[in-house]
């Protein structure tokens, strides 16, 4: 099974993907590194620009028949069996990105993306099998156990469990000033 772990930057994709792969006995693949290795991604100003169709070809060709947890912001655009969209309170996203040294503009963009369900909507547009998981106030172990429980119980689609519209007023500082 090829499982994509995706979400807004700062949501905890890598931590969860590595732990999930370990618990399931699956291979862990970082999509960014995979893209660079296959020559369909290049670094520009610290970010990797990827040719999506070319990357999807390599994912299909080399990973499709293996048990893999695919970690990456664009993993929901790849040919996978299941997409897990991690969600976190937008304030948490903003704080984590500020700690990582993101610009105010990038913090605002990513907080807004989380607020309006951008990654979830993209995942639903691409795949039938999408599971949304709210990571807010949960440990990585709790999150992974929730994901494994959903997979083992046969859940293929669980979306619409997160609604940040009620916290919009609290999030305005992150949209305007990157959290300051």
UniProtKB/Swiss-Prot annotation:
GO terms for biological process: ribosomal small subunit biogenesis; rRNA processing. Its EC number is 2.7.4.3. It is an enzyme of class 2 (transferase). PANTHER family: ADENYLATE KINASE ISOENZYME 6, POS9-ACTIVATING FACTOR FAP7-RELATED. Belongs to the adenylate kinase family. AK6 subfamily. One of its GO terms (molecular function) is ATP hydrolysis activity. Pfam families: AAA_18 (PF13238). Broad-specificity nucleoside monophosphate (NMP) kinase that catalyzes the reversible transfer of the terminal phosphate group between nucleoside triphosphates and monophosphates. Also has ATPase activity. Involved in the late maturation steps of the 30S ribosomal particles, specifically 16S rRNA maturation. While NMP activity is not required for ribosome maturation, ATPase activity is. Associates transiently with small ribosomal subunit protein uS11. ATP hydrolysis breaks the interaction with uS11. Interacts with uS11. Not a structural component of 40S pre-ribosomes, but transiently interacts with them by binding to uS11. ATP binds at residues 10, 12-15, 100, 138. This is Putative adenylate kinase. Residues 30-50 are annotated as: NMP. Residues 99-109 are annotated as: LID. Keywords: ATP-binding, Kinase, Nucleotide-binding, Ribosome biogenesis, rRNA processing, Transferase.
């Amino acid at each position: 099974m090829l499982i994509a772990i995706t979400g807004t930057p700062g949501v905890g994709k890598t931590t969860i993907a590595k732990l999930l792969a370990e618990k399931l006995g699956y291979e862990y693949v970082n999509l960014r590194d995979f893209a660079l290795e296959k020559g369909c991604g290049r670094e520009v100003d610290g970010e990797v620009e990827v040719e999506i169709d070319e990357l999807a070809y390599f994912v299909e060709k080399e990973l499709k028949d293996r048990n893999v947890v695919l970690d990456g912001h664009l993993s929901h655009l790849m040919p996978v069996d299941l997409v897990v969209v991690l969600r976190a309170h937008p304030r948490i996203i903003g704080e984590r990105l500020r700690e990582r040294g993101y610009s105010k503009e990038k913090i605002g963009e990513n907080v807004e993306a989380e607020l309006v369900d951008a990654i979830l909507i993209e995942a639903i547009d691409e795949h039938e099998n999408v599971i949304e998981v709210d990571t807010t106030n949960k440990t990585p172990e709790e999150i992974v156990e929730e994901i494994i429980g959903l997979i083992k119980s046969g859940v293929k689609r669980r979306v619409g469990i997160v609604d940040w519209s009620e916290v919009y007023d609290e999030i305005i500082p992150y949209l305007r000033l990157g959290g300051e």
